[in-house]
Amino acid sequence: DVAPPCLQYGHARAEALGTAIHFKQASCDALPYDDASVDVVFSSMFLHELPTHLIKAFFREAYRVLKRGGVLINMELPPNDALAAYDAFYLDWDCFYNNEPFYKDFRDLSYPNLCSDAGFAEDEFFQATMPRYTYVSETEFSQAASRDAAFDADTGRLSDTITWYAFGAQKNG
């Protein structure tokens, strides 16, 4: 994170829970890691908070720091073109009335192109949807994990029945 107060809170929370975590202050467009030095780059509900130029810079940095075989995973809002018109409208409405200046622009981007423009091969892109783990049985969760992404009215909505969306790519080249 770039915000010292967020890092201080995270550190205090981790210590209170007895969890050893090392936090680093850094910007997503200049990660403090060597080339090909990490196995996983993960972001959660982060990209829609950035202007487009920083989103693209983040993908280039993720590609740079990932080892061969490493994985980029982004848990995010689903793209506009994956949803029914009403559901896309609902999220656009939420963007405007929730004071989210970059939310809609992000959702209008091509997620596969974000990956391929950063260096990932087109066939390395993946996307997945998963139900909220605490809402469904382990059997339903396992079944969801074994099928292709399915978009519905709960995808990306903060509700008890939320369907989480993730996308990314594996660096094989």
Predicted regions mapped to residue ranges:
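Class I SAM-dependent methyltransferase SAM/SAH-binding core
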Residues: 1-30, 57
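A generic structural signal for alpha->beta connector loops
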Residues: 18-20, 69, 119-122
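Conserved Rossmann-like nucleotide-binding pocket used by diverse enzymes
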Residues: 24, 42, 73
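A short acidic, Gly/Pro-enriched loop at the edge of an enzyme's catalytic core
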Residues: 29-41
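A short SAM/SAH-binding and catalytic strip from SAM-dependent methyltransferases
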Residues: 39-53
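A short glycine-rich, Lys/Arg-flanked "PGG" loop and its adjoining helix->strand segment in the class I
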Residues: 56-68
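C-terminal alpha-helical "lid/dimerization" subdomain adjacent to the S-adenosyl-L-methionine
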Residues: 73-137
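Core SAM-dependent methyltransferase catalytic element
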Residues: 118-173
